[in-house]
Swiss-Prot record:
<protein>
    <recommendedName>
        <fullName>Uncharacterized 18.9 kDa protein in mobE 3'region</fullName>
    </recommendedName>
</protein>
<keyword id="KW-0614">Plasmid</keyword>
Length: 170
């Protein structure tokens, strides 16, 4: 019983490159479409073959754009989770995320697939709008105190307490 001979194949050809390119783009957009669909579902919306689309309130448009852009950032930079939120916020600020999402929705519409409003959409969208307003009104998280600031605070605390401070080994 011999080992079957397998011929080497040149993968750097246009037909193979074309197929790889189409596969990679399809995978990339499937990931983003999944994020779009999941966020729509979270807010009570769904996609269907339809002649008209549901109205797009600003809070819905922003949530969909954020979800798609965040998923895109996670995919493109898998080893940098600390930057996903910041880069997504930057893309929202400069309008890229919203334009990208609008383009995806337009491509779906060209296929006859449009966003539809489910029965719970109004309530879920109102709750999301309240959550966003609440988040915007909260003060930013304070940054942790430095070692010098902690030491200064402890000194001041014990001075005002008029009690001796124990030495803490460091």
């Amino acid at each position: 019983m011999g080992v079957a001979m397998i011929d080497a194949l040149n993968i750097a050809t246009m037909p193979i490159a074309d197929k790889v390119h189409r596969h990679m783009l399809a995978s990339y957009y499937a990931l983003q479409l999944d994020a779009l669909q999941a966020e729509a579902k979270r807010l009570g919306y769904f996609f269907a073959q339809a002649d008209t689309a549901a109205t797009m309130p600003p809070v819905l448009a922003d949530c969909l754009a954020w979800a798609v852009e965040y998923r895109r950032r996670c995919y493109l930079y898998p080893n940098c989770p600390e930057s996903w939120e910041r880069h997504t916020a930057d893309s929202m600020s400069d309008g890229y995320a919203q334009e990208h999402c609008r383009s995806m929705l337009a491509a779906l519409a060209a296929l006859g697939i449009r966003l539809q409003e489910g029965q719970q959409a109004y309530a879920l969208l109102a709750a999301e709008e309240c959550r966003q307003r609440e988040k915007a009104s909260l003060p930013p998280e304070p940054s942790p105190l430095s070692e010098v600031e902690v030491s200064s605070f402890v000194d001041e605390f014990f001075t005002k307490l008029d009690a001796p401070k124990e030495e803490v080994p460091t």
